[in-house]
């Protein structure tokens, strides 16, 4: 699977761009603020419905324009698909797939599985549990057909339960919500546990290659006491939840922890080592998807050289080449990505939102 063409209109500082892309490595070179990260963000937005640097639509729409428009062509294993997304300043989205409107953003995500590696991506390791839940949920979304519907319903019921907690006086008034919520919560938790167990060996193998000096352990925490039934716990915790005004325990508190010698990796590893670990997690997840479903991820790597010395850059470059996936890499100069440049690569020069193809001779 590869994105063969990308059209960008009024996104960030890019007025208009029409890019013919290659299945291997696509390099974006330019000074800071030139717009190279905006290209990566446009691809990410086409696959997620939102940008990775801002959740507000108005901030990614070019100045004085009413909306941004993105189009892409995806070369799949059997057919070519056409996808499109537009969003106005009020946040209203339109999704088009193969010429027809009325589709959902989740359908774009299924067609364009994307792994993102950015300088801000350390939050996967040193940020709150929500970032690691998102990591697990990405895998469950692409591996369990019923996951997204169950997850969406669970989130809706959690919101309704939290609102009800601020109005009810005894647990019986919540029972109707919990009878719906508990089966979904347990199913989501089981899917996450199964996925984390299934991918652990892939992560460990990649980490052994990237960080052989560390022995890492992985553990999934479902968000409530493993000895307790969730239905019983919710009833037992009612008074506490009512005082708090929200549900304190459940799958919305789940986490996926990584340790070395019993210590959290964020407290032991250097920033360069943490970046390699982050890359290992993203690569392992993408390779697991390929093995399970035959789908290849798109890898978006912003500021490739950040935190990595030349040895580590070569290591990451070789591993990315081995995936045979489509890779988009941004860098300030061509020298920073010389370890990646090969016969299957295409280089773009980005200057003040203008994108041109650059010869690699």
Curated annotation (Swiss-Prot):
PROSITE patterns: RECF_1, RECF_2. GO terms for molecular function: ATP binding; single-stranded DNA binding. It is found in: Cytoplasm. It comes from the Bacteria. It holds the Pfam family SMC_N. InterPro entries: DNA-binding_RecF (IPR001238), DNA-binding_RecF_CS (IPR018078), P-loop_NTPase (IPR027417), RecF/RecN/SMC_N (IPR003395), RecF_2 (IPR042174). Keywords: ATP-binding, Cytoplasm, DNA damage, DNA repair, DNA replication, DNA-binding, Nucleotide-binding, SOS response. Its main location: cytoplasm. ATP binds at residues 30-37. GO terms for biological process: DNA replication; DNA synthesis involved in DNA repair; double-strand break repair; SOS response. GO terms for cellular component: cytoplasm. Belongs to the RecF family. The RecF protein is involved in DNA metabolism; it is required for DNA replication and normal SOS inducibility. RecF binds preferentially to single-stranded, linear DNA. It also seems to bind ATP. This is DNA replication and repair protein RecF. It comes from Pectobacterium atrosepticum (strain SCRI 1043 / ATCC BAA-672) (Erwinia carotovora subsp. atroseptica). The lineage of its organism: Bacteria, Pseudomonadati, Pseudomonadota, Gammaproteobacteria, Enterobacterales. The gene is recF.
